[in-house]
Structures are given as structure tokens and as C-alpha cells.
């Protein structure tokens, strides 16, 4: 039996408003549950694929700074 996690996550949030997406992200981060990490990864993949080069550079800078803390 094969389970498509990426597809399940995308189906679960497809059509959500910005507020709903923010709630999903904040809830996943605040819960601190390891099982939420793959879903956050799928959401980041969507962001990355839809970002232009400047946005990607900005995200990488933010990530780099966050990892230095």
C-alpha cells in the first residue's frame, strides 16, 4: 500500500485562505510534534517553487540568520 503524503497535504490545504494557511502553519510549529514536519516541508516546497530568485535569496538569508541563533 502506497501513501502519497505530498498529495494528502496539498489536498488538505487546497483552497484555504491566507488566514487558514497561517493557522495551519502556526499550529504545526507551536505543537512541536515531529509528525507535523513533513507537512511543513510540503508547504515550504510550494513556497519555494512559486518564489522568484529574489524571494528565494531572501528566504535563504532568513534561514541562515535563524540558524545562527
From Swiss-Prot:
Induction statement: Expressed only in the forespore compartment of sporulating cells.
Which organism is this protein's natural source? Bacillus mycoides (strain KBAB4)
Q: Where is the signal peptide?
A: none
The Swiss-Prot or TrEMBL record describes its family as follows:
Belongs to the SspI family.
What protein name applies here? Small, acid-soluble spore protein I
Task: Quote the Pfam families the UniProt record gives.
Answer: SSPI
InterPro entries (alphabetical): SspI
Under the heading NCBIfam families, the entry gives:
SASP_sspI
Predominant location category: other
In the record, biological process GO terms are:
asexual sporulation; sporulation resulting in formation of a cellular spore
Amino acid at each position: 500500500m502506497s501513501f502519497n503524503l505530498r498529495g494528502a497535504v496539498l489536498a488538505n490545504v487546497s483552497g484555504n485562505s491566507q488566514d487558514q494557511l497561517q493557522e495551519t502553519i502556526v499550529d504545526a510549529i507551536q505543537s512541536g510534534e515531529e509528525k507535523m514536519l513533513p507537512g511543513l516541508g510540503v508547504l515550504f516546497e510550494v513556497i519555494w517553487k512559486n518564489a522568484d530568485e529574489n524571494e528565494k535569496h531572501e528566504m535563504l538569508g532568513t534561514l541562515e540568520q535563524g540558524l545562527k541563533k
